[in-house]
Amino acid sequence: EYANDAYGGSMGFPSMGATLYQKFADFVNNNAAIVKSYGMIPRAWNDGVYYGSYTSYFDPAIEINYWSSGWGGYTLAKASTLDSKGHGLINTNGDYYFILGKDDRFTPGTSTEHDPYEYDFCENFDMNRFMDGSVIEEPLGGMFCIWADYPGAETEQEVAANIRLVLRA
């Protein structure tokens, strides 16, 4: 979001170049230092951390929510790369996000539209297998995410009914 907001469109990081990307890394690291100074653990989504071929350093104390392996020309670091650089990883696989207003449903015996592993999340989710196919032996954990892109699209009761099976998995 930082790069997209600062540099326009949905492809912000490729538009930055190495110098501006370093400023982004400095921004992230400075904020991580502030978070750590209060005795908390900094966390970030994986989108911009070690993006593409940029070589800027990110504090390994930053835990990474790994949600996406990239899309059409948007080259994100592999989970295994982030792991090798010392970041703790939380598997927040974007194939299993529940997005209000997107008609997301998790039903036993079916797989999601974008499921690269062709298995049913409700029955076979593997916390060690990340969206890019990397297998991380000791991730920090997994997280099921609910995004309110359209907050008025569903009531709390509808959301609860639609995610019931996932929460039991």
Region roles according to the model:
Residues 1-63, 68-74, 79-86:
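Active-site neighborhood of glycoside hydrolase catalytic domains
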Residues 47, 54-62, 66-169:
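Flexible, acidic glycine-rich loops studded with aromatic residues
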